[in-house]
A protein has these predicted regions:
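Elongated alpha-helical scaffolds that mediate protein-protein interactions in large eukaryotic proteins
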Residues: 1-169
């Protein structure tokens, strides 16, 4: 029997992060003078760290192992887990997160200033990268999920054309 208890807590974490980022994005849209730097300084670093853990947890669950052990495990993706991540709405929230983080990420990758907010900016960049990794693993070897995510091909192509690949290792 597949243990899916992690789905609810992961869903709650996604909803919380997307809500916070959506609120911050609305503030930015209402006041264009607010910089992305100011926006992210208002984020709680603990929230970002815990969300990084959620993204790694979900990616590892697809393979039935920990994130850091995916390659060495030799496991194939578990189709039931991939399907659950789409059916529970986590995949939709993941796309919203990627959409919200795109502009801030572009600013982060183009700014190498050593500053007090560097740790937060690095965490935001890591969330952006892990979000794309999770999308890749949700669709791996699963045609139904590839079709589901195909509605966002334009978004993925736009991002791939403009993101500095050397920034994401």
């Amino acid at each position: 029997i597949l243990d899916v208890s992690y789905v609810l807590s992961s869903q709650e974490a996604f909803v919380k992060v997307v809500e916070i980022l959506s609120t911050e994005l609305k503030k930015k849209n209402d006041n264009p003078d607010i910089t992305w730097k100011e926006m992210f300084l208002s984020l709680n670093e603990d929230l970002l760290v815990s969300f990084i853990s959620v993204l790694k947890l979900l990616t590892g669950k697809i393979y039935g192992t920990d994130y850091d052990d995916i390659e060495s495990s030799g496991n194939s993706p578990i189709l039931q887990v991939q399907k659950i991540l789409v059916e529970t709405g986590i995949a939709q929230l993941l796309i919203e997160l990627i959409f919200i983080l795109y502009s801030p990420f572009r600013e982060i990758e183009s700014n190498n200033d050593i500053a007090e907010d560097r740790a937060i900016r690095n965490k935001v960049a890591e969330i952006f990268e892990l979000s794309y990794i999770l999308v890749k693993e949700i669709v791996k070897d699963f045609l139904e999920n590839k079709i589901y995510f195909s509605r966002w091909v334009k978004l993925f192509l736009e991002h791939s054309n403009f993101i500095n690949r050397t920034f994401i290792q």
